[in-house]
Curated annotation (Swiss-Prot):
GO terms for cellular component: cytosol; extracellular region; nucleoid; peptidoglycan-based cell wall; plasma membrane. The keyword Nucleotidyltransferase does not apply. Signal peptide: none annotated. It comes from Mycobacterium tuberculosis (strain ATCC 25618 / H37Rv). One of its GO terms (biological process) is response to host immune response. Changing residue 105 to A: Does not affect DNA binding. Transmembrane segments: none annotated. This is Nucleoid-associated protein EspR.
Length: 132
């Protein structure tokens, strides 16, 4: 596995949450699992998140995946993880108000105009010393 279970789980906590609020807390996840009839202790979830426990059961992975509305394969299948992680990165990017405003303004422009916007952004990134 290219990344640890803890890193993958924390990525979900950091990025998968409803609009208009911040990330879920461990207590919220435990309460939601309990409402589904699944028992998970706060110390156990903390150990999973810190990397002190590294081999959760399939049932635990399925319960956490269900909470975050993803497939449990996220935790075990590197190819699926990489695919979903790209989507999570996009989600993080689009949460930035400035990026969202640029995307909204570029929407509907002809392809040639969109390319000009991209070219200008690349110029600005180079000027700022950011990889384009």
């Amino acid at each position: 596995m290219s990344t640890t279970f803890a890193a993958r789980l924390n990525r979900l906590f950091d990025t998968v949450y409803p609009p208009g609020r911040g990330p879920h807390t461990s207590a919220e996840v435990i309460a939601a699992l309990k409402a589904e009839g699944i028992t998970m202790s706060a110390p156990y979830l903390s150990q999973l998140r810190s990397g002190n426990r590294t081999n959760p059961s399939g049932a635990t992975m399925a319960a956490l995946a269900n909470f975050f509305r993803i497939k449990a394969a996220y935790f075990t299948d590197d190819e699926y993880y990489e695919k979903l992680d790209k989507e999570l990165q996009w989600l993080c990017t689009m949460r930035d108000d400035g990026v969202r405003r640029i995307a909204q303004r570029a929407h509907g422009l002809p392809s040639a105009a969109q390319q000009k916007v991209l070219d200008r952004i690349d110029e600005l990134r180079r000027a700022e010393g950011i990889d384009a």
